[in-house]
UniProtKB/Swiss-Prot annotation:
One of its GO terms (cellular component) is nucleus. Keywords: Cytoplasm, Nucleus. GO terms for biological process: Golgi to plasma membrane protein transport; Golgi to plasma membrane transport; Golgi to vacuole transport; intracellular calcium ion homeostasis. InterPro entries: ChAPs, TPR-like_helical_dom_sf. PANTHER family: BUD SITE SELECTION PROTEIN 7-RELATED. This is Uncharacterized protein C31F10.16. The keyword Protein transport does not apply. It is found in: Nucleus; Cytoplasm. It holds the Pfam family ChAPs. Gene3D superfamilies: Tetratricopeptide repeat domain. It comes from the Eukaryota.
Length: 649
C-alpha cells in the first residue's frame, strides 16, 4: 500500500472513499469565520486491479483559486508526484490518480467551490451550499473564492490554533502579477468586506475594520509595496469617506507623517465622532510622546464608540504611558469583553493511515528530538511539574489576552505589591464589603458564588495573594469613590498571580542553587513553560535564559519563535538569522513554505542590512547547505521578485 502514497505530499487514507468530503459538505453551515483550509481529495486505482480503489485527502493553502483551470492544474501535479513515488520505490506504475476534487470555501457567498477532475477526462466545476444544493460558479464567485483563499493564507498561516498535520502552505502572492490580481480583487469586493467579520477584538465590523482590510495591511507589512494600496484607497475614498482612516494609517507606515496628519485633520473636521480616526490619532500622538493630547483624543474615542474594546483599551494605554495607574485600571475594567470564536474546523472521521513524509534530502539531524516537537507544540518524555502544565494564562484568547497583556505591563512598571495597593484603592474589596454588611441592617451576607473564585495557595517568597473583590454592593453603601471590579478582571488578577508565583519560585530556587554551587536542572518542557512565563511578564533576560536551556535538550518551535522576537528587538543579526533558519526548516518539514511572520522578519533584515551581508553571515554559521538553499529559495528569490530595497546580491 505504501506505493499508493504521493512521494512528498502529506495524505490521510480514508476508511471509506470520499468520507472526508461528505464530512466537509455536512459542516458548511457551521463555518462562522473565514472558513477552513482548502481540502483536496483523490481517488487512486490499481492498474492491475481497476476495481480496487483507495481515497486519500490532504489540506492546502495559498493555491491560486481564481479559476477552475488553476485548481485543476494543482490536481494534475498530484499525478506527477505519484509517478515520482513509484519510480522512487523502483516499481512500475501500479497506482494512478483517477479522480480528484479540490474544495475551496467562498466566505463571501458562503458556499464551497469545488473543481472535480477525472484523469484522464474532463473537469466539472460547481458550488455546494449549506443545504447540499449545487450552484453554477460565475466570474464573480471565482473572484470571491480567490480572495477567500488569500485572506486565509495571510491571516491564519502563523496561527498556531489553526495548525494541524497534513496541511501544505504556499505563498498566495508569490510575484508582482499575483499582487496586481490581489488588489484588483480587493477593489471589487471592498464594499463586502464587513460581511466577513473581523478580529476577535472588534464587536461590529465596518468598511474599514474587517478581515479584508486586515489582510491588505498584513500583506503591506510583509512587502512594504505601498503604491498599489495607495491607489486603491485614494480611489475608494471618493465613494466611501471612512477609507480616509486607512489612507492615514498607510501614510504612517510609509513614514509620510505630514500627509497622514493632514488627512486625519481634514477627515476629523467632517467625521468628528469617528472612533477609528481618533484611535489612529492617539497612536500617533503616543509615538510622539504627547500623552496629554493623546488623552483628549482617547476620551473622545470612548464617547464615540463606548461599546468597542479598542477604544477603552486605547484609553487604558494612554493612562499607562501617563503613569496614572488607577485610571488605567478603571479604563481596563470598563473594557467590554467579547466571546472568542475558534478558527473554522469540522469533524473528520478517523483515517485508516497517515502519510507524513519528510521532504527529499531533508537534514533530519538539524531538528533535534524532532518527534517531540510536532506542529508547534513540544512534548517532553520527562515528567513535568503538573502545576506548570495547568497554568491558565496560555489559554487566554482575544480581548481577554489583550487585557491580560495590559495588566502585566502595569505590573512590570510598578510591581505586584503596588498593583495590589492600586487595585484596593479603586475597587471595593471583599473585606470592605463585609464591613458594610455588618453596618447595614437587614442585608444578607453575599452568596459565595458571587465572590471571585479563590483557592488556598502556599505563601511564596513574600508574594501576597490578591484579595477578592466583590460583585455587588448593598444599596445604601457609603463607599462612593470606589468601583466594582468586573468578574473577568478579578480572574485575570488571579491568573497574573499564578504566573508571578511560578516565576518567583523559579528565581528563588535558581538563586539558592547558584549560591550553593549546585546545577539547577529542569526538564526541557519545563524550561519552555518557564520561558513563556518570563516573556509574558516582560522579563526578557530570564526568558532567553529559559528558552536557551530548553533548546539544549530538545527542539522547540515556541522557544525559537520567541527568541527571534527578542533578538530582532536587540538587533542581533547573527542570532536572528539562526532563529529564522531553524524556524524555516521546521516549517518546511511540515509542508509550510509560507510564513507571514518569517517573511516580514526577513524583509526587515534585508532592508536594514542588505541581502549580500546576510548571505555572508549565513555562510559563516555552518548551516547545512540544504537550509541555505531553502532560505535562498523562499526569501532571497522573493525579495528579488518584489525588488525589496537591499535585495541586490
Amino acid at each position: 500500500m505504501s506505493d499508493s502514497f504521493f512521494k512528498d505530499i502529506p495524505e490521510f487514507l480514508e476508511t471509506r472513499v470520499n468520507e472526508s468530503l461528505d464530512a466537509r459538505s455536512k459542516s458548511i453551515a457551521q463555518f462562522k469565520e473565514l472558513g477552513p483550509p482548502d481540502q483536496v481529495n483523490t481517488i487512486k486505482v490499481n492498474a492491475k486491479n481497476p476495481s480496487k480503489e483507495v481515497g486519500t485527502y490532504h489540506f492546502v493553502s495559498g493555491v491560486d483559486a481564481s479559476s477552475s483551470a488553476s485548481l485543476a492544474a494543482y490536481l494534475n501535479t498530484l499525478s506527477y508526484s505519484l509517478d515520482k513515488s513509484q519510480q522512487w520505490f523502483g516499481k512500475g506504475n501500479a497506482w494512478r490518480v483517477s479522480h480528484g476534487v479540490y474544495c475551496c470555501y467562498n466566505v463571501f457567498s458562503q458556499v464551497d467551490v469545488r473543481v472535480e477532475a477525472k484523469i484522464p477526462g474532463g473537469v466539472d466545476t460547481y458550488a455546494i451550499d449549506e443545504n447540499g444544493q449545487k450552484h453554477i460558479v460565475d466570474a464573480r464567485m471565482w473572484t470571491e473564492a480567490y480572495m477567500s483563499e488569500v485572506l486565509r493564507s495571510l491571516l491564519y498561516s502563523d496561527d498556531t490554533n489553526s495548525r494541524f498535520a497534513g496541511h501544505r502552505r504556499f505563498n498566495p502572492i508569490p510575484n508582482p502579477d499575483a499582487e496586481l490580481r490581489f488588489f484588483e480583487a480587493a477593489e471589487q469586493l471592498f464594499t463586502l468586506g464587513y460581511t466577513l467579520g473581523s478580529s476577535s477584538e472588534v464587536r461590529v465590523p465596518t468598511h474599514v475594520n474587517n478581515h479584508l482590510v486586515r489582510g491588505i495591511f498584513a500583506y503591506l507589512k510583509q512587502t512594504c509595496r505601498y503604491s498599489a494600496a495607495l491607489n486603491l484607497f485614494e480611489k475608494l475614498r471618493v465613494s466611501i469617506p471612512e477609507v480616509s482612516v486607512l489612507l492615514a494609517e498607510l501614510y504612517l507606515l510609509m513614514d509620510h507623517e505630514v500627509h497622514a496628519v493632514r488627512i486625519l485633520h481634514d477627515s476629523l473636521l467632517k467625521q468628528r465622532m469617528s472612533a477609528s480616526l481618533l484611535i489612529v490619532q492617539v497612536k500617533f500622538l503616543i509615538s510622539k510622546e504627547r500623552y496629554d493630547l493623546a488623552l483628549i483624543c482617547a476620551k473622545r474615542a470612548v464617547h464615540a464608540s463606548p461599546s468597542e474594546f479598542a477604544t477603552w483599551a486605547c484609553l487604558a494605554d494612554v493612562y499607562l504611558h501617563l503613569e496614572d495607574f488607577k485610571s488605567a485600571l478603571l479604563a481596563l475594567n470598563s473594557c467590554p469583553m467579547y466571546t472568542y470564536y475558534e478558527r473554522d474546523a469540522y469533524p473528520l472521521p478517523p483515517s485508516a493511515r497517515a502519510h507524513l513524509p519528510f521532504p527529499v534530502n531533508f537534514p533530519k539531524e538539524e531538528l533535534e528530538v524532532e518527534n517531540n516537537a510536532q506542529n508547534g507544540y513540544t512534548v517532553s518524555t520527562e515528567i513535568t511539574d503538573p502545576y506548570l502544565a495547568r497554568l491558565p494564562s496560555p489559554s487566554l484568547r482575544g480581548t481577554f489576552a489583550k487585557a491580560y497583556e495590559m495588566l502585566t505591563l502595569i505590573c512590570a512598571k510598578i510591581g505586584w505589591d503596588e498593583l495590589l495597593r492600586v487595585r484596593s484603592a479603586v475597587f471595593v474589596m471583599e473585606e470592605e464589603y463585609r464591613s458594610l454588611n455588618d453596618i447595614t441592617e437587614g442585608n444578607a451576607s453575599p452568596d459565595q458564588n458571587e465572590v471571585a473564585e479563590e483557592s488556598v495557595a502556599e505563601e511564596v517568597v513574600g508574594l501576597d495573594k490578591p484579595e477578592t473583590s466583590v460583585g455587588s454592593l448593598p444599596k445604601n453603601a457609603t463607599v462612593q469613590s470606589k468601583r466594582l471590579c468586573e468578574r473577568w478582571l478579578d480572574n485575570l488578577f488571579m491568573v497574573l498571580y499564578e504566573d508571578l508565583r511560578v516565576f518567583t519560585i523559579w528565581r528563588a530556587e535558581y538563586t539558592h542553587f547558584k549560591s550553593q554551587g549546585l546545577a539547577y536542572r529542569k526538564a526541557p518542557a519545563e524550561w519552555e513553560i518557564l520561558g513563556e512565563v518570563a516573556f509574558r511578564l516582560h522579563h526578557r533576560v530570564e526568558a532567553v535564559e529559559a528558552f536557551c536551556a530548553c533548546l539544549e535538550s530538545m527542539f522547540s518551535f515556541k522557544a525559537w519563535k520567541t527568541l527571534l522576537i527578542i533578538y530582532s528587538e536587540d538587533n542581533n543579526i547573527e542570532l536572528v538569522l539562526t532563529a529564522i533558519a531553524k524556524l524555516t526548516l521546521y516549517n518546511y518539514r511540515w509542508y509550510q513554505e509560507y510564513s507571514p511572520f518569517l517573511l516580514e522578519q526577513m524583509k526587515n533584515r534585508i532592508m536594514q542590512d542588505g541581502a549580500l551581508k546576510m548571505k555572508s553571515i549565513l555562510a559563516s554559521t555552518r548551516l547545512d547547505p540544504y537550509i541555505l538553499n531553502l532560505i535562498h529559495k523562499l526569501y532571497f528569490e522573493w525579495a528579488i521578485a518584489f525588488q525589496i530595497p537591499g535585495h541586490e546580491l
